[in-house]
């Protein structure tokens, strides 16, 4: 890690393979918490590159425990969080509305790190017991049209950095990764992001993947559709700005 940190402190960026290697090592517990904190802090001081984000995504997906729902078409509705607006868990609520409308939802979430409450906090407070058993989650999906996957049970790297993220209490690049590493590999994703820069980065990344997507950013700063201003929505077909009245 010392070589990687020295390289980054010279204002250089990581290639895709190097970024993947670092996050794989984090997932395997090779680095201590001080090294991981220093590494995460680098990306608080500058924007992440597309190559770095791709490498981090590659690492988490390589290490993850995948779920197989026999080709069932599902959707995930998720936000990066970190917009500083202190709203309630809108994407989590939206998942239940969509499931109630008859669509299959494979919701992937975590405890809040840069916010008061993440989707896992909400689901757990309702008495739900987290699990990573494929058959049990499939039964929930069949019976209720929704299942919930608590990220640390599927991603060792997220489990290892959880305490560090909570101690920092700030938005890190792991906020960006959560929506990109759903272990059920949903066929459609609706993703709210906290900045236009992040919306563009996500669009570049997801254009190279097979799943359908909508990326949402409210121009007044929310990582979801806003009731108080315009919202930009980006899909494979292009992008458009909608007013609150149009929505």
Q: Where are the regions a protein language model picked out?
A:
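A glycine-rich phosphate/pyrophosphate-binding beta-strand-loop-alpha-helix module
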Residues: 40, 88-144
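Core alpha/beta catalytic barrel or barrel-like domain that forms the active/cofactor pocket
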Residues: 70-78, 106-112, 174-177
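Glycine-rich anion-binding loops and their surrounding alpha/beta cores
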Residues: 7, 62-65, 87, 102, ...
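Acidic, glycine-rich active-site loops and adjacent beta-strand->loop/helix elements
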Residues: 79-84, 109-115, 154, 219-220
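Acidic, glycine/proline-rich low-complexity segments that act as flexible tails and inter-domain linkers
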Residues: 1-87, 101
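Short beta-strand segments at enzyme active-site cores
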Residues: 35, 106-108, 215
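Gly/Ser/Thr-rich helix-start
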Residues: 30, 80-83, 103, 113, ...
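Conserved active-site and cofactor/substrate-binding residues in soluble primary-metabolism enzymes
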Residues: 13-21, 30-38, 48-55, 89, ...
